[in-house]
């Protein structure tokens, strides 16, 4: 017996949509949505394809996701070509199966079933889809959100289909995400010969006490929703490659994943104060990729928990761990934002796969969420 969710997922996987190339995925989704009465607005920016689609009016529940995928890596290491979907032992293999073409298929099929049963639904059902989530994310969801906010679009609830689950579908639901702040720091010294250190100023030596103190800071202890803020050095570079040259500069890049106990300005102020304390000459550049956000218990969280409990008979954990997602942009609209998607064990890996039965289950969960909020 054929399954519309699996069939649509396979059609999407066959389109090699390496970010930000959509490769025809959105045209396929748009065709399905227009067939059930959705109005579709394409909102392309530069090399990125996006669309905003809606049906009905009133309180708005949007489903958000991305059609782009990361590169497959060495295709010869896959058990089948990465863009040729294959089912083995109940698992659907292919790049994007879990992140997140399976979720997109489940959303669309859920909408088709929902509209068939509730053609005159009382709320507004919407979709916000982009082809640039995995790469820079500069021209994707963030630009669509800015355009929607500029015209005062209303968005009450948003379900993001990112692969949130760990062992079984629905065991983890993300009701928030930590903020992400990156510091690109250059410590300036004076280049010279290692045999004449008095004629140079070694930025590595100067920066070492600063780095040690930075690493030792306990930024906060987190709270009931967020783990403690973490700081990790990601890159550090100095020197010419020669063993007889004192470097003139040290570059160090570090990233903060921060909770709602802090703001990005508080972090910046503490880092800058530490630099001044150690009397360093420096140039600094900050990149804030997202503020922390949290959706506390409310109508959306309750609807998602209800759907998981109904179909999988488990109570999901509400967590804010992991990386950033496009939910950070959507939360700016004042919407309640929750992430629910398939198991994430193989995302971005060789032989990415998802349990085919999980996608069928996910479509039912999505439909039940629609029924609770906009029927």
Curated annotation (Swiss-Prot):
It catalyses: N-succinyl-(2S,6S)-2,6-diaminopimelate + H2O = (2S,6S)-2,6-diaminopimelate + succinate. Pfam families: M20_dimer (PF07687), Peptidase_M20 (PF01546). CDD domains: M20_DapE_proteobac (cd03891). Zn(2+) 1 binds at residues 66, 99, 162. The active site is at residues 68, 133. Pathway: Amino-acid biosynthesis; L-lysine biosynthesis via DAP pathway; LL-2,6-diaminopimelate from (S)-tetrahydrodipicolinate (succinylase route): step 3/3. It is an enzyme of class 3 (hydrolase). GO terms for biological process: diaminopimelate biosynthetic process; L-arginine biosynthetic process; lysine biosynthetic process via diaminopimelate. One of its GO terms (molecular function) is cobalt ion binding. Its cofactor is Zn(2+); Co(2+). Keywords: Amino-acid biosynthesis, Cobalt, Diaminopimelate biosynthesis, Hydrolase, Lysine biosynthesis, Metal-binding, Zinc. The keyword Amino-acid biosynthesis applies. Its EC number is 3.5.1.18. Zn(2+) 2 binds at residues 99, 134, 348. Binds 2 Zn(2+) or Co(2+) ions per subunit. It comes from the Bacteria. Belongs to the peptidase M20A family. DapE subfamily. Catalyzes the hydrolysis of N-succinyl-L,L-diaminopimelic acid (SDAP), forming succinate and LL-2,6-diaminopimelate (DAP), an intermediate involved in the bacterial biosynthesis of lysine and meso-diaminopimelic acid, an essential component of bacterial cell walls. Homodimer. This is Succinyl-diaminopimelate desuccinylase. It comes from Escherichia coli O1:K1 / APEC.
């Amino acid at each position: 017996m054929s399954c519309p969710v699996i069939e649509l997922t396979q059609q999407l996987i066959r389109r090699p949509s390496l970010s930000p190339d959509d490769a025809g995925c959105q045209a396929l989704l748009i065709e399905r949505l227009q067939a059930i009465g959705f109005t579709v607005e394409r909102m392309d920016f530069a090399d990125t394809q996006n669309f905003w689609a809606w049906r009905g009016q009133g309180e708005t529940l949007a489903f958000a996701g991305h059609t782009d995928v990361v590169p497959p890596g060495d295709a010869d290491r896959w058990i089948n070509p990465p863009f040729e979907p294959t089912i083995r032992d109940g698992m659907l293999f292919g790049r994007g199966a879990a992140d997140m073409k399976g979720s997109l298929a489940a959303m669309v099929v859920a909408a088709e079933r929902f509209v068939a049963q509730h053609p005159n639904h009382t709320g507004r059902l919407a979709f916000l889809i982009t082809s640039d989530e995995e790469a820079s994310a500069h021209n994707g969801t963030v630009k669509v959100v800015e355009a929607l906010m500029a015209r005062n679009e209303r968005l009450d609830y948003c379900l993001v289909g990112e692969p949130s689950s760990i062992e079984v579908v629905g065991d983890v639901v993300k009701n928030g995400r930590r903020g992400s702040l990156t510091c690109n720091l250059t410590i300036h010294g004076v280049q010279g010969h290692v045999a004449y250190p008095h004629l140079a100023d070694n930025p590595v030596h100067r920066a070492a006490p600063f780095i040690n103190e930075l690493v030792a800071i306990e930024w906060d202890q987190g709270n009931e929703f967020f783990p403690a803020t973490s700081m990790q050095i990601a890159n550090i570079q100095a020197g010419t490659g020669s063993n007889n040259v004192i470097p003139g500069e040290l570059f160090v890049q570090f990233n903060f994943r921060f909770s709602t106990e802090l703001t990005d300005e508080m972090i910046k102020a503490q880092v800058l104060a530490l630099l001044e304390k150690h009397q360093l000459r420096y140039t600094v550049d900050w990149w804030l990729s997202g503020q922390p956000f949290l959706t506390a218990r409310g109508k959306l969280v309750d609807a998602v928990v209800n759907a998981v409990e109904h179909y999988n008979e488990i109570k999901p954990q509400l967590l804010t761990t992991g990386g950033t997602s496009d939910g950070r942009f959507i939360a700016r609209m004042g919407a309640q934002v929750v992430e629910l998607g398939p198991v994430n064990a193989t995302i971005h890996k060789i032989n990415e796969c998802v349990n085919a039965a999980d996608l069928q289950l996910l479509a039912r969960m999505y439909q039940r969420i629609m029924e609770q909020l906009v029927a």
